From Swiss-Prot:
Region (Disordered): 34-70, 267-345
Gene that produces this protein: GDF10
SUPFAM superfamilies in UniProt: Cystine-knot cytokines (SSF57501)
Basic residues compositional bias, start-end: 331-343
Propeptide positions: 34-368
First and last residue of the signal peptide: 1-33
Source organism: Bos taurus
Free-text function comment from the UniProt entry: Growth factor involved in osteogenesis and adipogenesis. Plays an inhibitory role in the process of osteoblast differentiation via SMAD2/3 pathway. Plays an inhibitory role in the process of adipogenesis.
Pfam families from the UniProt entry: TGF_beta (PF00019)
Subunit structure comment from the entry: Homodimer or heterodimer. Can form a non-covalent complex of the mature region and the pro-region.
SMART domains attached to this UniProt entry: TGFB
Glycosylation sites: N118, N155, N280, N469
A GO CC term attached to the entry: extracellular space
Protein name, UniProt field: Growth/differentiation factor 10
Principal localisation: secreted
């Protein structure tokens, strides 16, 4: 009978003690984990606030950082996030149009790790806006001190005193005139407060980079100096530093700028004949626009049913009335159904040069061309960089919707083609016919949008450029 009360009296205590012990163990484990667990590096900090982006949907840059083999390559991950940001928001990177990244080359100088950056790939037309140095910093704890063992105690044990405060680091920048591991000219020094844990940091080095470029010394070295010599052999790992330079390329709006920066070789090498050139023609690497066969894709006109390839060199030049039969001309009133039944075939047969198709085929062709607008308008065109041989160095996008403008600008021009005053007068003069040889206005792009391209330069550095006038938004007669 005595066992029953004892069991009931100990019951509540036996339930509370395990709970308290479990809670204490969890607290101790969390406290130890805050000091011993390996810190996971956050996304690289940048002046544009990418690290603070809390989009719940994972972007391709985040997926690449977590899954791809190059997940440790923070340069590629950071540049991909910049590309996604400016492609999505349509903004200009740092107020400019160019972001260049530069990887570090590790050298050991006086038993200390020194990181070298080759900035010579910057173009003269690129005006530097800002430059940031991205590096991974960890607290440098001094070695712990050992406490002498107490011999008087029954269970004598030795312990280590907790280490003192972490050492203060200095970030040193030097510029070099030659690509050698020398001291160089000191360009700047920054005192870094000890970080609470291992994390990525970014420092503004715009003045340093601008001064080095002004003096023609585009080889920079960076060193994290804590006063102690590095133990072991330094290696470039996943935490290698890098430099980002935001610039405004003044030549990006010049004609043919996209080919100047993205084309790695001439498609028509010197000595190689151009496609379609005569066997005994001279090997001039320049593209001869005047001698190229003129077709509907070159003169912004849609092909007609009776268009056939030229049979002789003198047959390359056509007049509009020779290529377009009367029923297919734009802005002509469509005849009634009864008139088409009676006169449609006779009129078409009298003006067309194609006589080898049956009536059913011709009706299908006529219906297809009536469905497609003949007036000046935007047409769909998708450009794949693999088709022009640029996919080897272009990272993203692989393709884009470029569109193009094509169609007729005949008098009277509707409002939808947004003709200029000059185009309106030109179409009237052409329609009157007093001045011979006046062509009709051309269907050209009116409004265009830019395109961000992420690619590798000749030094295998990742570059982001926002090219203007890459995709057609609207077309007009000019």
């Amino acid at each position: 009978m005595a066992r029953g009360p004892a069991r009931t009296s100990l019951g509540p205590g036996s339930q509370q003690l395990p709970l308290l012990s479990l809670l204490l163990l969890l607290l101790l484990r969390d406290a130890d984990g805050s000091h011993t667990a390996a810190a996971r590096p956050p996304p690289p900090a940048a002046a544009d606030g990418l690290a603070g982006d809390k989009n719940p949907q994972r972007s391709p840059g985040d997926v690449a950082a977590a899954q791809s083999p190059g997940a440790q390559d923070m340069v590629a991950v950071h540049m991909l996030r910049l590309y996604e940001k400016y492609s999505r928001r349509g903004a200009r990177p740092g107020g400019g149009n160019t972001v260049r990244s530069f990887r570090a080359r590790l050298e050991v100088v006086n038993q200390k790790a020194v990181y070298f950056f080759n900035l010579t790939s910057m173009q003269d037309s690129e005006m530097i806006l800002t430059a940031t140095f991205h590096f991974y910093s960890e607290p440098q704890w001094p070695p712990a001190r050992e406490v002498p063992c107490k011999q008087r105690a029954k269970n004598a044990s030795c312990r280590l005193l907790p280490p003192g405060p972490p050492a203060r680091q200095h970030l040193l920048f030097r510029s070099l005139s030659q690509n050698t591991a020398t001291q160089g000219l000191l360009r700047g020094a920054m005192a870094l407060p000890p970080p609470p844990r291992g994390l990525w940091q970014a420092k503004d080095i715009s003045l340093i980079v601008k001064a080095a470029r002004r003096d023609g010394e585009l080889l920079l070295s960076a060193q994290l100096d804590s006063g102690e010599k590095d133990t072991g052999v330094p290696r470039l790992g996943p935490h290698a530093p890098y430099i980002l330079i935001y610039a405004n390329d003044l030549a990006i709006s010049e004609p043919n700028s996209v080919a100047v920066t993205l084309q790695r070789y001439d498609p028509f090498q010197a000595g190689d004949p151009e496609p379609g050139a005569a066997p005994n023609s001279s090997a001039d690497p320049r593209v001869r626009r005047a001698t190229q066969a003129t077709g509907p894709l070159q003169n912004n006109e849609l092909p007609g049913l009776d268009e056939r390839p030229a049979q002789a060199p003198h047959a390359q030049h056509y007049h509009k009335h020779e290529l377009w039969p009367n029923p297919l001309r734009a802005l002509k009133p469509r005849p009634g159904r009864k008139d088409r039944r009676k006169k449609g075939q006779d009129v078409f047969m009298a003006s067309s040069q194609v006589l080898d198709f049956d009536e059913k085929t011709m009706q299908k062709a006529r219906k297809k061309q009536w469905d497609e607008p003949r007036v000046c308008s935007r047409r769909y065109l998708k450009v794949d960089f693999a088709d022009i041989g640029w996919n080897e160095w272009i990272i993203s996008p692989k393709s884009f919707d470029a569109y193009y403008c094509s169609g007729a600008c005949e008098f009277p021009m509707p409002k939808m083609v947004r003709p200029s005053n000059h185009a309106t007068i030109q179409s009237i003069v052409r329609a009157v016919g007093i001045v011979p040889g006046i062509p009709e206005p051309c269907c050209v792009p009116d409004k265009m949008s830019s395109l961000g391209v992420l690619f590798l330069d000749e030094n295998r550095n990742v570059v982001l450029k926002v090219y203007p006038n890459m995709s057609v938004e609207t077309c007009a007669c000019r």
